[in-house]
């Protein structure tokens, strides 16, 4: 039987993979993907704890995080498209070229 520990281990591993992607990558699009992996890892943890404690609070938090992640993707990808059209690059290092 799959217990709570298994779900939390998978959640922790996914979070570490997302964190490593955030720290290692210099591409804005890959940073968004890493953020989504981290948010989904948190969702797995919330839903697993919610399931084993018979409390719906974790599932409500997961739905809230999904809604926030959807808005982040919509706004973030729009900004990434505009950034690519203007600078022809998605590297984080090109952010230093911003003036404002």
From Swiss-Prot:
Its EC number is 7.1.1.-. One of its GO terms (cellular component) is plasma membrane. The keyword Membrane applies. GO terms for biological process: ATP synthesis coupled electron transport. InterPro entries: NADH_UbQ_OxRdtase_chain4L/K (IPR001133), NUOK/Mnh_C1-like (IPR039428). It is found in: Cell inner membrane. It is a multi-pass membrane protein. NDH-1 is composed of 14 different subunits. Subunits NuoA, H, J, K, L, M, N constitute the membrane sector of the complex. Belongs to the complex I subunit 4L family. This is NADH-quinone oxidoreductase subunit K. It comes from Helicobacter pylori (strain B38).
